[in-house]
Amino acid sequence: MITIDKILEILKNDHNFREILFHEHYYYNWTQNVTFNALSYDSRQISSDTLFFAKGATFKKEYLDSAITAGLSFYVSETDYGADIPVILVNDIKKAMSLISMSFYNNPQNKLKLLAFTGTKGKTTAAYFAYHMLKVNHRPAMLSTMNTTLDGKSFFKSHLTTPESLDLFRMMATAVENQMTHLIMEVSSQAYLTKRVYGLTFDVGVFLNISPDHIGPIEHPTFEDYFFHKRLLMENSNAVVVNSQMDHFNIVKEQVEYIPHDFYGDYSENVITESKAFSFHVKGKLENTYDIKLIGKFNQENAIAAGLACLRLGVSIEDIKNGIAQTTVPGRMEVLTQTNGAKIFVDYAHNGDSLKKLLAVVEEHQKGDIILVLGAPGNKGQSRRKDFGDVINQHPNLQVILTADDPNFEDPLVISQEIASHINRPVTIIIDREEAIANASTLTNCKLDAIIIAGKGADAYQIIKGNRDNYSGDLEVAKKYLKR
């Protein structure tokens, strides 16, 4: 619960309070005792003791009217909608949501050790490594793109990489109730752009890498804006871990100079000196030989990043070693074998850079024909389409089948044609994703061949016109076509 007095105190201290407006009268304080027992930004989830946040560019007064009909008595907004209830007017509703929900849930962030990962790719894999390292001797909760757990037993799919602040602090409070000791999070650039983690300080923040992504009309207008919002995690962490091989490393290095930090990768103290398919050796703070189930040097680097972060949280080298050896990630480099010996790789690679690294790993182990099944999502990350084409052009022997991948409100054929326009040779377009996978499965001949199904990973749905339509998932579909 939270009182109106506490809300006004929070907003005034953050210089985010304008006034309370009710029936054209302006108030700096509110003399009546009002207590709220629920917070909501969904007008369909309202009771008489709910504080409602009228947020978003698409918010309509009809939503507020519906909430008032359901018993709403107070709301927070950047705009006065002229309703017959008081409005707390603020300059920035997203900041208000974060700080008010933090207090409403009794500051759960102070009762957990917080570990956050950011980067264009690898966040989920690194989070899973950290989860397995910590769970050897601790009770970690995890908020991940792939799966979320607040008790270490039950897992559910997240809708956003980083939840809205009201949901985030509610989930943190649930983790505290479940006696969890740590919280591992993926923090997206959008989370900082939309202030979902405003006011939150992490015990350790990890910056894995950066490459152009999430640039478009409803995301970041430029790469500079994307990169800037990624770097905000560094400013809001008590200690940081940074990949020394990442693009634009020098500015990040300067930014973290006075923050406790570890660098990993080439030209740093913590570097891989030997890399094999299922083991690697590290020198530096983590010096040891590690067994690993996820192939690819980039996965080994993600393991190092997670290990250095966990080391700062007091985890032993032995627990880090055990955690790395136990880690698997749904939809990340999952491998099937056809009856003819050919391999099928199912992976979440969903931008140009992650596709480039995936192809490099597969080509290292499979020397025959390689077939790529790929699509791009609609209404987001539009720069990926050209990036995919550029990567494919660097692999002239790659056979390509373009297909649907969460087209949302766009036409999947148009998306596929746009990707194809950036490819310098003919490709096949099969919009039905299962049909595309079935077709690819007929093109292999021997154990040297491989099929790569990229983009969706373990997602068992297709986003079409704003809805999550049923889809078996790439791995389950691929299993149907193993006989070849």
Curated annotation (Swiss-Prot):
Q: Where in the cell is it found?
A: Cytoplasm
**Which SUPFAM superfamilies does the annotation name?**
MurD-like peptide ligases, catalytic domain, MurD-like peptide ligases, peptide-binding domain, MurE/MurF N-terminal domain
Primary localization: cytoplasm
Annotated positions binding UDP-N-acetyl-alpha-D-muramoyl-L-alanyl-D-glutamate = 43, 161-162, 188, 196
Highest taxon of the source?
Answer: Bacteria
Part of which pathway? Cell wall biogenesis; peptidoglycan biosynthesis
Name the HAMAP family on file: MurE (MF_00208)
NCBIfam families linked: murE, PRK14022.1
The name on file for this protein is UDP-N-acetylmuramoyl-L-alanyl-D-glutamate--L-lysine ligase
Organism annotation: Streptococcus agalactiae serotype V (strain ATCC BAA-611 / 2603 V/R)
Q: Which gene encodes it?
A: murE
